[in-house]
Amino acid sequence: MKQPKWQRRSEDRPREICAAALDVFAEKGFAAAKLDEIARRAGVSKGTLYLYFKDKEQLFRAVVRDSIAPNVAAITSAISAMEAPFADVVRMFLAGFAEREARLPVGAVAKMVIGESRNFPELARVWHDEVASKAIGALAAAIERAQQRGEVRDGDPRLFAFSLMGPMVLGALWRATLVPAGGQPLDLPALAKQHAETVLQGLLR
């Protein structure tokens, strides 16, 4: 006998709730996001949502860990495993950021974290621990290895990593914040490509 849909898919519920929460957080921000709406979009009751997540902050942490952090991990793992010249690592990293930002509302979630971190400091801690520090750390480690090989000029690897990431984060925030308000559209993959060539001129020996 065929099982009811709710029984067959019970293992998918946390993932579906997180996917719905990601959309609602990106659209409305953390404070304005309502668990009732998240549950409705996920196709579950609010009571069911509470079986998996005790509050909105725990749900946000799960969203970051399940939806965004794996993409960061994929890029950072690729960087760590690459034995290619540093220039190729930079091009891959920046292109990968642009490609994933096109699929996930990274800029919108980052905007939310920035805007609401004073009232909800846990958001900033989660974003720092699961996303920002890992991306910067992996990039800084790649830069340090390239310095040891003589590819990259002397300097603080972590500061170089911030120089590489800064324009991409600004681009993601621009698309999430200013384009919906009438700002000029931004081609993030084109920015990634041009920025890579520009910054490599200053980094490479």
Q: What does each of the following model-derived ranges do?
A:
Residues 1-44, 51-58:
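Basic, helix-initiating cap at the start of DNA-binding domains
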Residues 10, 18, 64, 124-136, ...:
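Amphipathic, non-transmembrane alpha-helical scaffold segments
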Residues 142, 198-205:
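C-terminal alpha-helix
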Residues 73, 99-141, 182-185:
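Short secondary-structure transition hinges
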Residues 125, 133, 147-197:
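Hydrophobic/aromatic-rich alpha-helical bundle segments in the mid-to-C-terminal region
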Residues 27-31, 82, 149:
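Short coil/turn segments at alpha/beta junctions that flank glycine-rich nucleotide-binding fingerprints
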Residues 61-67:
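Alpha-helical DNA-contacting segments of helix-turn-helix folds
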Residues 62, 76-110, 158-164:
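Hydrophobic alpha-helical connector segments
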